[in-house]
Amino acid sequence: MLNLFRQSGLRFLWLAVVVFVIDQVTKHWIVANLEPYQAIQYTSFFNLTHVYNYGAAFSFLSDAGGWQRWLFTGIAIAVCGLVTWWLKETTRQQVMLPVAFCLIIGGALGNVFDRLLHGFVIDFLVLYYQDWYWPAFNVADSAICLGAFLLVIDMFKNKDNVNE
């Protein structure tokens, strides 16, 4: 078992733990220091705003009546299981792919924890330009997006290696 851990992408699981902890610490700080919907402007394009997201990305299905909490929790847990299995299948030589998987796992578990504990996800990072606002997000969402981006990069990197 230890050999499998050392020889596969499972050796990067610490990154998922780091993402989860940073996500939860930042959310705890927001809850402790900002009232719901209170904003602190830092620049002309960025602020911290304490908001609750009852839906998925971009508040998808946020007003669906509560059942979506369990749907999104179930999907996230299933995805984490699948991605962990894929992580186990990676080789020692692969780095970008297991890092991407662990970013996704850590972010997904951070949001699952919120859904189970609160019934919603705490978002607080807001980017905007004049009257155009990107939907609020959090560290977990950022890790998931970065992981997905790295998956795409890895896919094209491996495509180039196969064609040579």
UniProtKB/Swiss-Prot annotation:
The keyword Protease applies. It holds the Pfam family Peptidase_A8. GO terms for molecular function: aspartic-type endopeptidase activity. Its EC number is 3.4.23.36. GO terms for biological process: proteolysis. The active site is at residues 123, 141. GO terms for cellular component: plasma membrane. Pathway: Protein modification; lipoprotein biosynthesis (signal peptide cleavage). It is an enzyme of class 3 (hydrolase). It comes from the Bacteria. PROSITE patterns: SPASE_II. Its main location: membrane. It is a multi-pass membrane protein. The chain crosses the membrane at residues 12-32, 70-90, 93-113, 133-153. It catalyses: Release of signal peptides from bacterial membrane prolipoproteins. Hydrolyzes -Xaa-Yaa-Zaa-|-(S,diacylglyceryl)Cys-, in which Xaa is hydrophobic (preferably Leu), and Yaa (Ala or Ser) and Zaa (Gly or Ala) have small, neutral side chains. It is found in: Cell inner membrane. Keywords: Aspartyl protease, Cell inner membrane, Cell membrane, Hydrolase, Membrane, Protease, Transmembrane, Transmembrane helix. HAMAP family: LspA (MF_00161). Belongs to the peptidase A8 family. This protein specifically catalyzes the removal of signal peptides from prolipoproteins. This is Lipoprotein signal peptidase. It comes from Pseudoalteromonas atlantica (strain T6c / ATCC BAA-1087). The gene is lspA.
